[in-house]
Amino acid sequence: MANRPQALKIHPQPVLAPGELDSVRRQLAAASAQERVRWGLARFPGRIVLASSFGAQAAVSLHLVTREQPDIPVVLVDTGYLFPETYRFVDELTERLGLNLQVARPAHSAAWQEARFGRLWEQGVEGIERYNRMNKVEPMQQALETLGADAWFAGLRRQQAHSRQQRQVVEIQNDRVKVHPIIDWTDRDVHRYLTRHDLPYHPLWHEGYVSIGDVHTTRRLADGMSEEETRFFGLRRECGLHDLV
């Protein structure tokens, strides 16, 4: 059952000791995705969560992490504008994998925001950035605070976009550690994992959607388009969640 984030017990200690980041990166660069997950869980017991948009290939990270810790909080940011297929996909995977789903939502509903600000996603780059800040960045920040998370897993991959090619397996942002267990996986690696474990792609994947976010800012991949152009009218690739949180 989906819940609002519930507070966890916090065990204060340094996120990473001085000079530890470089050695951890070297250690995990040669490790498997499963070993990277185990490192994160061991290094931050009770203080690490998994973020998921329940996008095209989300089942990989959800399965990979929860097979090691079934009750890890899984944070979904619900903007109120997800595809109907996404909500059903959330329900399907939550039931199948027994997820400890924690749903983070904006301070104001979609209808309230439209009444107050209009359709921000139609107001150019500035409007899109404001929309993403209110509906994605701020809810995620609040969820991490509420859950007492010093670290979080994310399913980013370098192959997904030019903006992700310099991402590291472990990063520090805003005094929190981000762990990317499948950062160096290819599309073929993802497909093999899904096939091996009989896991589904997002339903819209089979209709030509390769990157799936909100209804109003997601398009099918067409001939001549890059994956980046399927989001936010090609004005930007990232929603800001992985840059600002």
Swiss-Prot record:
Reaction it catalyzes: [thioredoxin]-disulfide + sulfite + adenosine 3',5'-bisphosphate + 2 H(+) = [thioredoxin]-dithiol + 3'-phosphoadenylyl sulfate
GO CC term, one of those recorded: cytoplasm
Ranges in coiled-coil conformation: none
Keyword Cytoplasm: yes
Any one GO BP annotation for this protein: hydrogen sulfide biosynthetic process
Enzyme class name: oxidoreductase
Pathway: Sulfur metabolism; hydrogen sulfide biosynthesis; sulfite from sulfate: step 3/3
Chief location: cytoplasm
Family: Belongs to the PAPS reductase family. CysH subfamily.
UniProt name for this protein: Phosphoadenosine 5'-phosphosulfate reductase
